[in-house]
Amino acid sequence: MPILYEIEYNYMLNSILLLTSFLGTAVPNDADSTVFKTVGLSEVTVVEFKKSKENLATNSVSVVDSGFINRHELQSITELTAVVPNFYMPEYGSKQNTPVYIRGVGAKTKGSAVGFYVDGIPHFENSSFDVDMSNIASVTVFRGPQGTLYGRNAIGGIINVTTVSPLTYQGTQFKLGYGSHNDALFQFSHYNKLGSKMGYSVAGGYHYNDGFHRNMFTNKYADQLKDAYGRVALVWLLDNKWFLRVNSMLDYSNQGGYPYGKYNRLTGETEPVNYNRYSSYRRLLSTSGVNIRYAGENISFSSQTAFQYIRDRQGIDQDFTSNDTYFVKNRLKQTMLSQEFILKSNNSSRYQWLWGAFAMSQHINNTVETQYITKDNAFPTHYRIPVNALAIYHQSTIKLFSGFSFIAGLRWDYENSTLKYLRETYQLSTDGARTEVKNVNSSLHFNQITPKFALQYQDECNNNSYYFSVTRGYKAGGFNQTFQKEEETSFGPEYNWNYELGGKVHLLKDKLYAEAALYYIDWRQQQVNQTVPGVGNVIHNAGHSSSKGFELALNSSPLKNLSIALSYGYTYAKFIEYQKSAKLNYSGNMLPMVPRNTLSCSASYALYPSSTSFIDKIVLTAGLTGLGKIYWAEDNEVAQNFYALLNAKISITSGIFTWECWGKNITDTHYNTYSFKSSADYAQIGKPAYFGTSLLVKF
């Protein structure tokens, strides 16, 4: 075992042994047992069918609450991988690359196939997904198409992040942390009420890390991280029927990135990072939103207005070698304004309905410059891509008889986008005059209707439910921001039919909750990403694909103050028909970037020492997540076999102070988190074992 890791192991072990000398007899706290009955089982579970927009969905919906997030030290949304079954959000490259895959449905670049919302504000670009997880009340993951319930259609599902409300929690918190690789963290939050019906919150933080991957050429870490954020919110209950929420977030990241080393297919070994130019990514992300709601006796209304601004800059040594061959600069500015209206029934009648309308205007200005150092020339390419979208959706639920209900929904989508493309060239050494190489002006229009049908049975006596649903998914096409051939300028829409059979049951007097689902996805014209050396990512449409599998989630509280969660997902996703070219036929191959298995096991136990101890509470948490097998490209020539990561945390509370110690990938499992083929095979090694400690002050 490396010396550094051995010291850190001994440090945590000695801390735990020292702790036991201060413990009295562990006496369960009856007040806390109530919390476990009402909250513990819902940490990673499926939302029940209640009269809310979210719970009208007749498919798998998993919720991760703030307790689970804090006990497992989840600092990024990517750490929900495998915690939610068949959910995969790989962490590689930089924050610019944050793809999401649910049941094999996803997109590596150019617009996610999974919708992402933070307090009702949509995030449409992958580069805006990786945000800080502090002060999060819950993360809800909807698996399967959600077009009849959410604004912009998401062919794979929805991630809905909700922050803490100052009307439900008041207090001030400071957190100071330090860990391996010089990881430093500072966070603060303040929640307060101005009277009985108005509240405000202010939160912020800073995170620094030296990095995990050393560049052998520069002898410096390639993936240093500096991140700062701030959030403000105002919540106002105008009266018993009207509600107003105004919130804004600003996030700035400056990081080294793309720590890729050469990968040897024969030995399965990945070499250290070794390229001559520093690669980096900087992102400024700003989001603001206004939500107005009305809840009457028979109807409810919601209006969500949102604005998002992204400005980022990428620099990448795209030959990934010590040779000074070529370097790529990528600068992007995006603005997005969206409006969503929802009107739905709000009573207990046999017929429930929901109507929604969504409009969006997005403007992207992007400049990608490829510098060919050895040839002493550069090719800057300028893109202007405005996108306008409009959608109207409806869902009806009819209660039939004896607990049976029939659900039908319909969605209409319209989207148009235009491309203004200008490619130039100039001499690098002189930074001379630009010469036009290519000029393209083009436009695209998409129009689509997608239905949904479902039958559900609700056993109200035991609070169990069962369902079967058939849903059509759709994702519009668009323009490639890099291309070599005329036919690569744009790509078409993709479609799927999602068939699902599932059930959700409470057992053993509500001490065990179980959820299971079987699904089959028939996928047409899948949007597939191809990495072109020196050019970037190009999207094209495959012919016919399928994804089938099942999911199982168990949550139990067998003893007071003990909660156990288990989730497993299996996905078998392959190309049924994919003739890429005259010579390349990938029909029958597995889809890339899709784990065959996802596994998560976790347990948390709270102890309450006797009144003679100065310690109020101790929480012990351990979790294991597993993934694999994952193919990295359509040719299925390189893959990552199944691997598992073990994490643990202990927190000790005394009065207003809480001390935490945690470790991630404790067994120092070696695995690749991403791989691709360029001039050679390259891969990024996953994070090694690392540890940390933090002090929280709450008052």
Question: Could you describe each region identified by the protein language model?
Answer:
Residues 28-70:
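Short, acidic, small-residue-rich periplasmic hinge/interaction motif at the N-terminus
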Residues 77-80, 99-104, 117, 141, ...:
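N-terminal periplasmic accessory domains that precede
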Residues 354, 406, 414, 520-522, ...:
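Gram-negative outer-membrane beta-barrel transporters
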Residues 291-318, 458-475, 490-548, 557, ...:
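Membrane-embedded beta-barrel scaffold of Gram-negative outer-membrane proteins
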Residues 332, 336-348, 352-356, 396, ...:
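Conserved C-terminal beta-signal and adjacent last beta-strands/turns
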Residues 171, 178-209, 217-255, 284-290, ...:
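Transmembrane beta-barrel wall of Gram-negative outer-membrane proteins
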Residues 234-239, 249, 343-346, 350-352, ...:
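Structural signature of Gram-negative outer-membrane beta-barrels, strongest in the C-terminal barrel
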Residues 119-145:
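Short acidic/polar hinge/loop motifs at secondary-structure boundaries
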